[in-house]
Amino acid sequence: MAAEYTYRVSAWWTSGRTGLAKCESSPNTIHFSEAAEMGGLEGRWTPEQLLLCALAGSFTTTFHEVARSSKFEYTDLEVEVEGSVRRNRSTGSGFSEILVRPRLTVVSEEQREAGLALLRKTKAMCMISRAITLPQTLEPYVETGKIPVEGWSQQDAAVKLGV
């Protein structure tokens, strides 16, 4: 059964090369700026980073759903997304390539191939990935690690267990 959802985001310039963005479902606003390389401020999110963040977040939540429906257990997933932007004053700047580097941690070596297959399936199913029409390269990595102790963060587990 298909369902349709609508999402709204508003953005407005505040001054110079900076602005604010917000959505209906969150009381928080995001301060953003043009990229520092293009004359914007350091230390603020840029529209380029927000696009990559949307892809990383969507990939993460899509993988969680794919893994859950496949009854695949994992201990951690970190998704790094890198985008290359070409600046062209006559035609406008644009992304030339996006690299998606998911790092999946599983309990046993026997899960490695299944984990890789689910990462590839996630790329095909990810809503934001499908919405971006430029080339995207998936560079998945699956590693084995220990199961963190209940209540520990992944960072705590990495430090305390040597994961």
Where do the language-model regions lie?
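Extended beta-strand/beta-hairpin segments
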Residues: 1-53, 64-163
